[in-house]
Amino acid sequence: MRTAYYISDGTAITSEVFGHALLSLFTIEFEHITVPFVETEEQAKQVVKKISESFQDDGQRPLVFYTIVNTEVRKIISKSVGINYNFLDQFVAPLEIVLGVPSKPEKHRTHSIHEKTYDIRIEAVNYALANDDGSNLQEYDEADIILVGVSRSGKTPTSLYLALQYGIKAANYPFTEEDMGDILKMPPALKRYKDKMFGLTIEAQRLHQIRSERRANSRYASLQQCRMELREVENLYRKEKIPFLNSTRYSIEEISAKILATTGLQRKKY
């Protein structure tokens, strides 16, 4: 197994995102080690020592992805035995040439509370939590989007990801067996918000597996029940012309990106 380090003088989120994106292209198993807030030369030396230990243990040079502003700290990391990828050097220098202005790197700027849209993200997260699972319908006027679907189809994690990553206020509403009766109809409380709605669906077998982890051997988790509920919600989506997505084979990140591409919603984070 190859070891990959993600190092930064901040949260290391940027290093992780870039590094994971690159490594996901390879069918190799990695041990991922994240080291945030490396801000002093002494801390950098400790990290270099740890990289050397990984090399001795694995017999392979670790991959080292890092974003560090301080020049001296960066030099120390660059001298590790790992195969080093300095994202600042890789991308910033060419951008300075293209843009015609020098960069002004600052620690913690990318993911800090001083980021001007920080409050937007926090407000969106609070909104998603307060409007989870059909609660607070009176606040739906504020929603940028309302995710609908059967229980355990991915509405809550997607709502939270949209809030945290994009600053989007996402409410979610579950269609339950009680809503269905003989046939599922649009709940009266949702009719005025139809233009904000986006549906999630999922393969019945996968829904059965997810529900069984929560309530094994229950009617709620039975394959027959899952098939019935999914059939009803998909019929409603088509009848009401609600855009929808089958989430079975997608990650939360992919689901969120597809929702934005389909609806035209714009991120508010930057």
Curated annotation (Swiss-Prot):
Keywords of the record: Kinase, Nucleotide-binding, Serine/threonine-protein kinase, Transferase
Residues annotated to bind ADP: G149, V150, S151, R152, S153, G154, K155, T156
Enzyme Commission identifier(s): 2.7.11.33, 2.7.4.28
Pfam families named among the record's database cross-references: Kinase-PPPase
Classification via InterPro entries: Kinase-pyrophosphorylase, PSRP
EC top class named in words: transferase
GO molecular function annotation: ADP binding; ATP binding; phosphotransferase activity, phosphate group as acceptor; protein serine/threonine kinase activity
Protein family per UniProt: Belongs to the pyruvate, phosphate/water dikinase regulatory protein family. PSRP subfamily.
Purpose: Bifunctional serine/threonine kinase and phosphorylase involved in the regulation of the phosphoenolpyruvate synthase (PEPS) by catalyzing its phosphorylation/dephosphorylation.
Name of protein: Putative phosphoenolpyruvate synthase regulatory protein
